[in-house]
């Protein structure tokens, strides 16, 4: 008996934060616009509209750099409470078509419409109808990807942006995957991509035609995952309830810092108290698995360190801080963050019985 073919849609709002600002303020519609932090406060760009992207402005770019590329760029502060409200409105539109919704962020989600009856059960028509509803009711545009597996649905949603959609039918999966650059696979970052290129891998087809054991030897678990993706395999389900996995706080400094004492003062007085508050909201019994520190140096290199610990402890961050600063090599520090990985809910419930 053949396995049932799934119908997965990935919906991705077009430059979401900036689009909301342009919708709510008509004066913003024909100018280069970004949502982000102030350049004097070492801010970064959260998102920008397509006019700004013509000049090379991108998300996560320092605001100062964005203004160098586009001097007439208007940078406005974010209104997160508004974006959350709009995200709930988008979610309500999704729920007209399916209950199998996996939000990835405020502006994107996976939908499983395999058993949906709307639009005669056509995933293509459902995606089109959802996008029309969003445009007509909310004044925003969305792009969508339709495929039988999750990672390809996400890839497809980027193929006809903005305000478009792209379908990868089951019989075309391997053909599309073969020609897919490895950087298009979700989860392949800059460092991983560089290592893959050094090993001679550029397309999924290169991975598909390689030796599986050699991939494992060179790239470990990522090698195994890439091998599956390159063969058009992605068994992941659309997860309706996404359990929160981590809690974190961070601070970008208006002036770089450099010493252990400066870092510890920020941790003790600012970051740790805020982390405690957030952990209390996310996990009242404060059950965790790991705690860690993140540092971004002045050259924008990011490094993290963590260790296993069942409870949040301020003193444990001292050793982590000493260890992570061994990687400093004379560089100043631009950003400092703390995080904890939460214990899975089921595991926490089981432990509470004893």
Curated annotation (Swiss-Prot):
Q: Report the sequence similarity comment from the record.
A: Belongs to the DNA polymerase type-Y family.
> What is one process in the GO biological process aspect for this record?
DNA-templated DNA replication
Q: Where does Mg(2+) bind?
A: 12, 107
Q: Which UniProt keywords apply?
A: Cytoplasm, DNA damage, DNA repair, DNA replication, DNA-binding, DNA-directed DNA polymerase, Magnesium, Metal-binding, Mutator protein, Nucleotidyltransferase, Transferase
Top-rank lineage group of the source organism: Bacteria
| One Gene Ontology CC term in the entry | cytosol
Query: InterPro entries from the xrefs?
Result: DNA/RNA_pol_sf (IPR043502), DNA_pol_Y-fam_lit_finger_sf (IPR036775), DNA_pol_Y-fam_little_finger (IPR017961), DNA_polymerase-Y (IPR050116), DNApol_IV (IPR022880), IMS_HHH_1 (IPR053848), Rev_trsase/Diguanyl_cyclase (IPR043128), UmuC (IPR001126)
Question: What are its cofactors?
Answer: Mg(2+)
Active-site residues annotated for this sequence: 108
What sequence ranges are listed for the domain UmuC? 8-189
| Pfam families, per database record | IMS, IMS_C, IMS_HHH_1
Q: Specify the species.
A: Vibrio parahaemolyticus serotype O3:K6 (strain RIMD 2210633)
NCBIfam families under this entry? PRK02406.1
Q: What is its EC number?
A: 2.7.7.7
Q: What is this protein for, i.e. what is its function?
A: Poorly processive, error-prone DNA polymerase involved in untargeted mutagenesis. Copies undamaged DNA at stalled replication forks, which arise in vivo from mismatched or misaligned primer ends. These misaligned primers can be extended by PolIV. Exhibits no 3'-5' exonuclease (proofreading) activity. May be involved in translesional synthesis, in conjunction with the beta clamp from PolIII.
Assembly and interaction partners: Monomer.
User: What is an example of a GO molecular function annotated in this UniProt entry?
Assistant: magnesium ion binding
The reply on keyword Transferase is yes
Note accompanying the cofactor annotation: Binds 2 magnesium ions per subunit.
| Protein name (Swiss-Prot/TrEMBL) | DNA polymerase IV
Q: Spell out the reaction equation it catalyses.
A: DNA(n) + a 2'-deoxyribonucleoside 5'-triphosphate = DNA(n+1) + diphosphate
Subcellular location per UniProt equals: Cytoplasm
């Amino acid at each position: 008996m053949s396995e049932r073919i799934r119908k997965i849609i990935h919906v991705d709002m077009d430059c979401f934060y900036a689009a909301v600002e342009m919708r709510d303020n008509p004066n913003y519609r024909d100018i280069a616009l970004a949502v982000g932090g102030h350049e004097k406060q070492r801010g970064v760009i959260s998102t920008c509209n397509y006019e700004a992207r013509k000049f090379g402005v991108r998300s996560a770019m320092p605001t100062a750099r964005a203004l160098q590329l586009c001097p007439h760029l208007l940078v406005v502060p974010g209104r997160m409470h508004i974006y959350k409200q709009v995200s709930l409105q988008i979610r309500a539109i999704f729920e007209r078509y399916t209950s199998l919704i996996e939000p990835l962020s405020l502006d994107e989600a996976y939908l499983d419409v395999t058993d949906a009856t709307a639009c005669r059960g056509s995933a293509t028509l459902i995606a089109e109808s959802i996008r029309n509803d969003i445009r007509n009711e909310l004044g925003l545009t969305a792009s969508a990807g339709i495929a039988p597996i999750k990672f390809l649905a996400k890839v497809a949603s980027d193929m006809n942006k903005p305000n478009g959609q792209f379908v990868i039918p089951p019989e075309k999966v391997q053909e599309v995957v073969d020609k897919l650059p490895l950087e298009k696979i979700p989860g392949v970052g800059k460092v991983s991509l560089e290592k893959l290129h050094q090993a001679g891998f550029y397309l999924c087809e290169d991975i598909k035609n390689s030796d599986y054991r050699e991939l494992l030897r060179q790239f470990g678990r990522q090698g195994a995952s890439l091998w599956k993706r390159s063969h058009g395999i992605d068994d992941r389900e659309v997860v309706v309830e996404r359990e929160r996995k981590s809690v974190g706080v961070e601070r970008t400094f208006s002036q770089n810092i450099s010493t252990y004492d400066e870092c510890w003062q920020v941790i003790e007085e600012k970051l740790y108290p805020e982390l405690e508050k957030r952990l209390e909201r996310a996990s009242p019994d404060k059950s965790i698995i790991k705690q860690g520190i993140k540092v971004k140096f002045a050259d924008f290199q990011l490094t993290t360190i963590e260790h296993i610990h069942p409870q949040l402890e301020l003193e444990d961050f001292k050793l982590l801080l000493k260890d992570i600063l061994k990687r400093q090599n004379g560089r100043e520090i631009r950003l400092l963050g703390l995080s904890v990985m939460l214990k899975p809910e089921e595991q926490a419930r089981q432990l509470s019985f004893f």
